Amino acid sequence: MKFAPILLASAASAHTIFSSLEVNGVNHGVGGGVRVPSYNGPIENVDSASIACNGAPNPTTPTSKVITVQAGQNVTAIWRYMLSTTGSAPNDIMDISHKGPTMAYLKKVNDATTDSGVGGGWFKIQEDGYNNGVWGTEKVINGQGRHSIKIPSCIAPGQYLLRAEMLALHGAGNYPGAQFYMECAQLNIVGGTGSKTPSTVAFPGAYSGSHPGVKISIYWPPVTNYQIPGPSVFTC
């Protein structure tokens, strides 16, 4: 695959940001309840505290807004290349070379505006890997940057952090190389039954640099089966 190095070089700066959250058809605006960074670069060290909700080298901006969401409904994370990007064409989202899975996690917290997200309590509620030759990131890139996430109906009500993530594997043949893009939204989830308690993981800790879903060549040999990193998806 002689073209791969050229492809990687040309796409090296094609990053992305989870910039806003849409609930019930209402977009809460860039940085409205989402801790957006000042730079759109990735986190590559899975052992960094920044793997939780982003951070150094991408300082995030605090927000006092907490978005109320009904348990059981779908919300939409909106991804854009930069905070100032207004379009929704594929190039406005992330370079198409950035192929990999999408994921989403929740963490129950006492105060969504102050909890750093670092540490335990996280459970996965969505993932989309490699299916029928199409990556989860491709669906978001070609779908106007829309990343649909269902909030479980059976969790306890209260404040949560929602961690939406896209993982780009174009340079993941060695570790570090995989590019993790994530931000955290601040939610107040209402109407949950609290009938099930999810098993949880920690960030950092949920991912390993040696995991086959983190260290993988997606160019050669051709990918036939992909193992998404992290825990299984929590279901009610």
Curated annotation (Swiss-Prot):
Location(s), subcellular: Secreted
Disulfide links within the chain: C154-C236
Residues glycosylated per entry: N74
Reactions performed catalytically: [(1->4)-beta-D-glucosyl]n+m + reduced acceptor + O2 = 4-dehydro-beta-D-glucosyl-[(1->4)-beta-D-glucosyl]n-1 + [(1->4)-beta-D-glucosyl]m + acceptor + H2O
Residues annotated to bind O2: H170, Q179
Name of the top EC class for this enzyme: oxidoreductase
Pfam families: AA9
Practical use: Lignocellulose is the most abundant polymeric composite on Earth and is a recalcitrant but promising renewable substrate for industrial biotechnology applications. Together with cellobiose dehydrogenases (CDHs) an enzymatic system capable of oxidative cellulose cleavage is formed, which increases the efficiency of cellulases and put LPMOs at focus of biofuel research.
Function of the molecule: Lytic polysaccharide monooxygenase (LPMO) that depolymerizes crystalline and amorphous polysaccharides via the oxidation of scissile alpha- or beta-(1-4)-glycosidic bonds, yielding C1 or C4 oxidation products. Catalysis by LPMOs requires the reduction of the active-site copper from Cu(II) to Cu(I) by a reducing agent and H(2)O(2) or O(2) as a cosubstrate.
Protein name from the UniProt record: AA9 family lytic polysaccharide monooxygenase G
